[in-house]
């Protein structure tokens, strides 16, 4: 007499009861697939946790002087590593220097002309 399981669960037959080799092969394939899915899910969750932890970490705020030095030497993400500046960046920096020096010379001559017109300086 068979014992009834609670909640109307049926008694499961064991895989060893089947003699068909194809069923055993299908079972192995299914087991391999589920293991592969589990390992992929673990990797995905680890990657997600890693990205979330990196996103949560606050990056240290650099002082203004350090940011200017990093810009000058072409250091983008590596703070302590000096990288050779590329040609485009060299041209941009050169043009910035020309612009700043031109502005300073213009301001100097502008103030000079203003003082000459006011009569403080003599020509």
Curated annotation (Swiss-Prot):
Disulfide linkages recorded for this protein, renumbered to the chain, are none
Q: Where is the composition biased (Basic and acidic residues)?
A: 31-57
The places in or outside the cell where this protein is found are: Membrane
The ranges of region (Disordered) come to 31-58
What GO molecular-function term can you cite, just one? protein transmembrane transporter activity
Report the GO terms under cellular component: membrane
What keywords appear on the UniProt entry?
Membrane, Transmembrane, Transmembrane helix
What Gene Ontology terms for biological process does this UniProt record contain?
Answer: protein secretion
Record-annotated membrane-spanning stretches:
91-111
Q: Does the keyword Metal-binding apply?
A: no
What topology does the record note for this protein and the membrane?
A: Single-pass membrane protein
Stored NCBIfam families? secE_bact
- The molecule here is called Uncharacterized protein MG055
Recorded source organism is Mycoplasma genitalium (strain ATCC 33530 / DSM 19775 / NCTC 10195 / G37) (Mycoplasmoides genitalium)
């Amino acid at each position: 007499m068979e014992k009834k399981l609670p909640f109307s669960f049926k008694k499961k037959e064991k895989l060893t009861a089947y003699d068909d080799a194809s069923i055993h092969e299908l079972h192995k394939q299914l087991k391999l697939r589920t293991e592969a899915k589990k390992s992929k899910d673990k990797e995905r969750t680890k990657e997600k946790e890693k990205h979330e932890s990196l996103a949560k970490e606050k990056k240290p705020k650099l002082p203004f002087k350090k940011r200017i030095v990093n810009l000058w030497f072409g250091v983008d993400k590596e703070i302590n590593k000096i990288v050779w500046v590329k040609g485009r960046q060299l041209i941009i920096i050169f043009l910035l220097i020309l612009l700043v020096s031109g502005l300073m010379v213009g301001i100097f001559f502008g103030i000079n002309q203003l003082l000459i017109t006011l009569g403080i300086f003599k020509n």
